[in-house]
Amino acid sequence: MLLDEPFSHIDNFRKNNLRRKLFNYLREKNITCIVATHDSTDALSFADKILVMKEGKLVAENPPKILYNTPPSKYVASFFGDVNEIKLDKISKSTSKKTILLYPQDIKIDASSKYKAIVKQAYFMEGIYLIEVIFDDQILFLQHDKYIDSNKTVGIHFSTEIIKLRSN
């Protein structure tokens, strides 16, 4: 079965239930399905394998969890939402000029951190806030459970586990 953007014009309250029912049915009946989508929820939640294409060329192919956790490029990572690209030497002891990709949930507010950022804006998003900060003259996005006022200086923590995973 081939589905092209199958849920793009359906309201969220119907879409989520319909998605679960459809993909559960396909799995139960062992029906192969290819879904062309720009919606990461379709891919992450229900796919066995994700193929990412750019300008007609295959640029990535892996199971959802692997592709999400170790995206090979900013283009691929951005399929899953906002992504930050930061020089490794700015957030670790590394002297490498290599960049690393971090999702907003990979960066935490931590008052005791040596890394400081200035809050530019906070956006409410389904129970959390997407916080836009300026760090080392660069815009970064992070998630936080509370609103933070603009122009406030905050400490930010970069997950060493994620840095290690994505810097290899």
Annotated model-derived regions:
Residues M1-P72:
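ABC ATPase nucleotide-binding domains
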Residues I10, L67-T70, S78-F79, D110, ...:
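Residues that scaffold the ATP/ADP-binding catalytic core of kinase and kinase-like folds
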Residues I34, E85-K87, Y115:
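Structural detector for hydrophobic anchor residues on beta-strands
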Residues S40-T41, S73-K74, E85, I148-D149:
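Alpha-helix N-cap/helix-start and coil->helix boundary motif
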Residues K65, D89-I91, K120:
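Conserved positions in beta-strands of structured domains
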Residues N69-I91, T99-L101:
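C-terminal boundary and immediately downstream tail of ABC-type ATPase nucleotide-binding domains
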Residues K93-N168:
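Non-catalytic connector elements of ABC transporters
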